[in-house]
């Protein structure tokens, strides 16, 4: 019969004509010559359904629906050409890697690119393109020779010449490596071309070709051979005018028109007659009795075009972001199914950005209980088995890095080997917390002989291990043993392996030891039981794919020497190519596809998603090995490669046309106002085109979230989604906004059909929830707090910062995950302990602090840090070179502070009487400060004071408190007033209260001071002598705080002070006596008033805590907020937007006014 064409524009039912003809042939002669219906891969399933689903042709041994690759497999199976080993993408890339590594000499163009990630992938794509377009190394060599003949080569021509030189070498070597043994996907078609003549099933067969718009040269060669052996070839093309031989490149049908004329030419050259084409009428296809769609199809690419007046079943939607878009479309689909009697298979969603829409559609449509099939292969990359393989290689390669180890464990594929301490997800989390806190970061630390120790750093004088720590130590070591048992063997084998075969065997044996096939089978059964057969099938596919990958690597490069790092890269490249093959889970489902890949028919309603500028049509990328200019240069010299980006963009317009004309009954188009990151997006020009053709579509419908949607009835859908929408609507009502009456009917339905105590009841009850914690019941308080509460002053400061912060930290004992790092509190403890020891050593050695030299200060600092660093935070200062440097800098800070303290001591008549002075515990010199509370509880304060100094004046004893701080700090009386700075004055109160028993004499307050331990930097405007520098540095250590307003006492703190400002304390004396106003001073009665105020705050906090008071009441003072560094925000959920959540804002009160407040408070309490 020869060749014939079935031609017609979109919607003319070309496929139906072919199917009808095939059915007729099967019916007439069921066992006649073969019929092959060749379609693209993604079209085979739906055409099989279309051909064999009716009762007349529910099966056939004569007709087969195949793709080109499936036809090749079928023919090679018959003729014996299928004996060669198939090589996949990973095998090709391994072969290319080997070719590159074995090349002698330099490269002309690829030298820098060879080591870049993705180069092998680009190279593979280039070779595939060359094969697909039947370009041989000789063809490239001719192009290179032609370019070399140019006397004056442009830079582009020079670059292309060098690329061709490298490419010829690689291509020739690659073909030689494949020859006789391997075959890739492109070679399969080449073998098919060679074997068609020997195939009996193709002899005298009827061939039908559908769903293609163009063919590669290789596919054209297949068709040429089919023409010579088959009885007939029928090709369906989307084309309007077959007689137009010189169609413009801007013509909508340029691509299929070129295809039509190329196939005619091939038939003529093969001596095959070509029948007159069958041209189908647009008005007799899908658009019969649908003039609006006929108008769309006819004028889609015509300008000017008449407008279609009147209402049309075409709607344009806009959405604020992709989630709102998909949510709105799911509601539209549900409405079509529920109210318009559509079947799921009547509906299609067409997209351009799978990475944006696939997960959203799958999740949201599942919520709406809408069966959906996404016509796209999914990568296996995120399957637990793949994660296990990739992570174990990172473990070995990264010397047992923690993140890699725990990725291995969290796959759930490492079995427990200890019944008493099983390796569950909870225990894995505990183990992870341990290794992060204790700095376990290497293979040596994991597999070393020493047992892990569990003992937290709680200060330099707290060294005993608790019972709980001993229990945790036992469990951590038992978990560790199981990890070592699971990983150590494969680690050793992978390190010892030298060839690809050894590496693959080590991996395979490890997976078998873990019984991965059995574990995957259990997972498959679980998914089958859950009604998720697709997920079940994935378990089989992923194991088969991994084994095939290992087999291929061994087959291609088994004896090749390969480092583990190179093997890891090669295996990763192979893994990235692995994909799940899915078939539709049912005959009735919504189809989701991309417009350039999917082939759809019999679609009643089509949704086009994300119709935005730059996406519809899509700007093509041009990042290949041969760029755009070089492709044009080759084409001008007669070598045709794949289309340029300009041609791709023009062809994309043809795919737009197909998408906009695919539906029979309804077309719904949506575009985004912003992307998932909130960036503004513009609608595609196609939106304006539709508005021009159909003025009735200009009023766009906004797809919004439930709480903003005016048409709320659309949200009455499934039980799950309706409950979510109902909650949003009732929340609006609660805020005073009107809602649609239908929601009260929905609410009543849930009340009647869902039991109390169930999920729905709890969700609706949540509408009445206020973020206000309830006070603790009496029995709870008694369980949390003993009758005699021992508390530090900082704990009570926390209470005044925020009651809930105190509750979370001290009552519930919540804490952040501890990490192996040196925090500010750790540095502060080091400073305190170092300065204490240095002072003790100086006194013990009979030296005078005031006579200390810089050299001595440095010596003492080095001695202190050397002694303390092994105890500090699990020896963190010994863990790395970085921390060794930090240790050196900390020594310098301590040395400088020690020297300055000596200089201050030389000018002071105050001397230390207590260092790191503890109070409140039985072994301490000073008893606790105890307060009986009115509710029967006793508040017992305990703590540790950095330093207490004493001096005597006129037979009176004066005490001052000095606190060492690693950051600059002063005494803010506002903070004292509100209770968030109690510590210094409380400590002063403690030592004054117990001074007679402690020191044998009742003492008076001299002041409270903060000493900033640091190594300051100074800025100089001009040259400075060493003495000037020392003087400026000394000023930087001026202490801040509050002093007794007694000139003699202040002079005893700075004997050099006669008039002016002191360089040691925050006071300044006038010439004629008295203090300057900026001095930080208070008289004796004020100190007593402050002492009384502190007492009241401490008692008040104790009463509130023991009464069970818990409030979310963080303070705010200027720019400071209790929430800023609070780790418990995820627990309290404080939100100032909520009516019930407000900051306690501290008034900004002047210091004099504060002192008056303190005095009035003292009078009232007195």
UniProtKB/Swiss-Prot annotation:
Gene3D superfamilies: 3.90.320.10, 6.10.140.1030, P-loop containing nucleotide triphosphate hydrolases. ATP binds at residues 8-15. Binds 1 [4Fe-4S] cluster. Keywords: 4Fe-4S, ATP-binding, DNA damage, DNA repair, DNA-binding, Exonuclease, Helicase, Hydrolase, Iron, Iron-sulfur, Metal-binding, Nuclease, Nucleotide-binding. GO terms for molecular function: 4 iron, 4 sulfur cluster binding; 5'-3' exonuclease activity; ATP binding; double-stranded DNA binding; helicase activity; metal ion binding. The keyword Iron-sulfur applies. Residues 1-290 form the UvrD-like helicase ATP-binding domain. [4Fe-4S] cluster binds at residues 802, 1123, 1126, 1132. InterPro entries: ADDB_N, DNA_helicase_suAddB, DNA_helicase_UvrD-like_C, P-loop_NTPase, PDDEXK-like_dom_sf, PDDEXK_AddAB-type. Its cofactor is Mg(2+); [4Fe-4S] cluster. Pfam families: ADDB_N, PDDEXK_1. The keyword ATP-binding applies. Residues 283-588 form the UvrD-like helicase C-terminal domain. One of its GO terms (biological process) is double-strand break repair via homologous recombination. Its EC number is 3.1.-.-. It comes from the Bacteria. Despite having conserved helicase domains, this subunit does not have helicase activity. PANTHER family: RECBCD ENZYME SUBUNIT RECC (PTHR30591:SF1). The heterodimer acts as both an ATP-dependent DNA helicase and an ATP-dependent, dual-direction single-stranded exonuclease. Recognizes the chi site generating a DNA molecule suitable for the initiation of homologous recombination. The AddB subunit has 5' -> 3' nuclease activity but not helicase activity. Heterodimer of AddA and AddB. Belongs to the helicase family. AddB/RexB type 1 subfamily. This is ATP-dependent helicase/deoxyribonuclease subunit B. It comes from Oceanobacillus iheyensis (strain DSM 14371 / CIP 107618 / JCM 11309 / KCTC 3954 / HTE831). The gene is addB.
């Amino acid at each position: 019969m020869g060749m014939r064409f079935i031609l017609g524009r979109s919607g003319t039912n070309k496929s139906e004509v072919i199917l009808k003809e095939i059915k007729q042939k099967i019916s007439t002669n069921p066992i006649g010559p073969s019929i092959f219906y060749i379609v693209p891969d993604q079209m085979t399933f739906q055409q099989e359904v279309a051909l064999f689903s009716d009762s007349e042709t529910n099966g056939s041994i004569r007709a087969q629906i195949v793709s080109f690759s499936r036809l090749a497999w079928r023919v090679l199976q018959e003729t014996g050409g299928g004996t060669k080993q198939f090589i996949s993408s990973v095998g090709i890339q391994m072969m290319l890697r080997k070719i590159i590594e074995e090349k002698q000499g330099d490269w002309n163009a690829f030298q820098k690119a060879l080591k870049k990630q993705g180069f092998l992938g680009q190279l593979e794509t280039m070779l595939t393109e060359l094969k697909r377009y039947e370009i041989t190394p000789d063809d490239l060599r001719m192009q290179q020779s032609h370019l070399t003949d140019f006397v004056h080569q442009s830079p582009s021509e020079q670059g292309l010449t060098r690329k061709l030189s490298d490419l010829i070498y690689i291509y020739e070597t690659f073909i030689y490596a494949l020859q006789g043994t391997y075959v890739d996907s492109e070679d399969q078609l080449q073998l098919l071309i060679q074997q068609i003549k020997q195939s009996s099933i193709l002899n005298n067969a009827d061939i039908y070709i559908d769903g293609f718009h163009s063919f590669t040269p290789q596919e054209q060669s297949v068709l040429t051979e089919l023409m010579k052996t088959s009885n007939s070839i029928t090709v369906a093309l989307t084309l309007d005018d077959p007689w137009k031989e010189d169609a413009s490149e801007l013509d909508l049908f340029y691509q299929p028109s070129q295809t039509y004329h190329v196939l005619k030419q091939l038939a003529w050259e093969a001596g095959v007659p070509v029948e007159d084409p069958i041209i189908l009428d647009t008005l007799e296809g899908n658009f019969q009795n649908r003039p609006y769609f006929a108008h769309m199809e006819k004028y889609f690419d015509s300008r000017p075009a008449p407008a279609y007046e009147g209402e049309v079943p075409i709607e344009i939607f806009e959405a604020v972001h992709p989630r709102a878009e998909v949510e709105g479309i799911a509601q539209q689909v549900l409405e079509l199914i529920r109210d318009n009697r559509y079947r799921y298979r009547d509906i299609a969603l067409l997209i351009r950005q799978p990475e944006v829409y696939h997960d959203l559609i799958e999740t949201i449509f599942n919520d709406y209980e809408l069966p959906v099939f996404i016509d796209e292969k999914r990568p296996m990359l995120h399957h637990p088995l793949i994660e296990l393989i990739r992570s174990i290689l990172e473990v070995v390669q990264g010397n047992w890095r923690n993140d890699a180890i725990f990725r291995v464990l969290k796959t759930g594929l490492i079995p427990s080997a200890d019944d008493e301490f099983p390796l569950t997800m909870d225990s894995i989390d505990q183990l992870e917390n341990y290794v992060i806190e204790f700095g376990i970061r290497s293979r040596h630390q994991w597999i070393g002989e020493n047992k892990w120790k569990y003992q937290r750093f709680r200060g330099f004088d707290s060294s005993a291990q608790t019972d709980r720590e001993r229990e945790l130590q036992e469990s951590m070591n038992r978990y560790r043993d199981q990890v070592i048992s699971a990983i150590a063997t494969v680690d050793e084998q992978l390190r010892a392996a030298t060839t690809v075969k050894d590496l693959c065997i080590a991996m395979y044996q490890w997976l078998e030891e873990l019984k991965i096939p059995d574990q995957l089978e259990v997972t498959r059964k679980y998914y089958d039981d859950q009604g998720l057969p697709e997920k079940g099938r994935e378990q089989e596919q992923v194991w088969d794919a991994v084994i095939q990958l290992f087999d291929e690597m061994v087959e291609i490069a088994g004896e090749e020497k390969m480092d583990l790092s190179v093997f890891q890269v090669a295996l990763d490249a192979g893994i990235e190519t692995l994909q799940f093959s899915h078939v539709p889970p049912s005959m009735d489902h919504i189809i989701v596809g991309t417009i350039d890949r999917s082939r759809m028919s019999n679609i009643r309603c089509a949704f086009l998603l994300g119709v935005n500028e730059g996406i519809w049509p899509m700007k093509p990328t041009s990042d290949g090995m041969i760029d755009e200019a070089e492709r044009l240069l080759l084409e001008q010299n007669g070598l045709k490669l794949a289309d340029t980006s300009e041609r791709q963009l023009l062809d994309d317009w043809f795919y737009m046309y197909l998408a906009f004309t695919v539906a029979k009954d309804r077309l719904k188009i949506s575009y985004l106002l912003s992307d998932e990151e909130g960036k503004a997006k513009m609608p595609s020009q196609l939106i304006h085109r539709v508005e021009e053709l159909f003025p009735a579509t200009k009023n766009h419908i906004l797809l919004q979230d439930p709480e903003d949607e005016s048409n709320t009835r659309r949200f009455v859908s499934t039980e799950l989604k309706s409950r979510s929408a109902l909650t949003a609507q009732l929340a609006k009502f609660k805020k005073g906004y009107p809602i649609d009456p239908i929601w009260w009917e929905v609410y009543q339905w849930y009340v009647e059909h869902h039991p109390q105590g169930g999920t729905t009841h709890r969700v609706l009850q949540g509408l009445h929830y206020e973020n206000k914690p309830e006070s603790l019941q009496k029995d709870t308080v008694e369980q949390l707090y003993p009758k005699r509460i021992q508390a530090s002053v900082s704990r009570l400061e926390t209470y005044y910062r925020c009651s809930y912060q105190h509750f979370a930290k001290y009552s519930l004992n919540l804490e952040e995950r501890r990490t192996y790092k040196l925090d500010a509190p750790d540095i502060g403890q080091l400073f305190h302990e170092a300065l204490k020891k240095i002072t003790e050593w100086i006194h013990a050695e009979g030296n005078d602090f005031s006579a200390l030299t810089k050299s001595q200060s440095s010596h003492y600092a080095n001695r202190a840090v050397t002694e303390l660093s092994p105890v500090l935070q699990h020896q963190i200062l010994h863990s790395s070179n970085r921390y060794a440097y930090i240790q050196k800098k900390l020594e310098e800070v301590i040395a400088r502070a020690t020297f300055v303290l000596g200089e201050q001591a030389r000018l002071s008549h105050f001397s230390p009487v207590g260092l790191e002075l503890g109070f409140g515990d039985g072994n301490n010199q000073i008893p606790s400060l105890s307060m009986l509370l009115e509710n029967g509880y006793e508040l017992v304060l305990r703590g540790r004071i950095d330093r207490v100094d004493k001096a005597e004046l006129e037979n009176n004893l004066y005490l001052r408190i000095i606190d060492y701080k690693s950051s600059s700090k002063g005494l803010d009386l506002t903070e004292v007033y509100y209770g968030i700075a109690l510590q210094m004055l409380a400590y002063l109160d403690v030592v004054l209260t117990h001074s007679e028993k402690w020191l044998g004499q009742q003492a008076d307050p001299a002041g409270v001071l903060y000493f900033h331990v640091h190594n300051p930097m100074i800025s100089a405007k001009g040259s400075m002598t060493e003495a000037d520098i020392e003087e400026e540095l000394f000023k930087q250590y001026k202490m801040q705080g509050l002093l007794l307003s007694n000139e003699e006492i202040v002079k005893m703190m700075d004997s050099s002070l006669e008039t002016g400002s002191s360089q040691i304390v925050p006071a300044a004396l006038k010439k004629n006596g008295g203090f300057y106003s900026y001095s930080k001073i208070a008289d004796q009665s004020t100190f007593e008033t402050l002492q009384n105020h502190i007492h009241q705050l401490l008692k008040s906090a104790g009463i509130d805590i023991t009464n069970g008071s818990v409030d979310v009441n963080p303070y705010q003072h200027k720019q400071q907020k209790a929430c800023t560094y609070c780790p418990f925000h995820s627990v309290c959920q404080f939100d100032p937007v909520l009516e019930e959540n407000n900051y306690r804002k501290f008034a900004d009160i002047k210091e004099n006014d504060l002192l008056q407040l303190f005095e009035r408070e003292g009078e009232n309490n007195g």
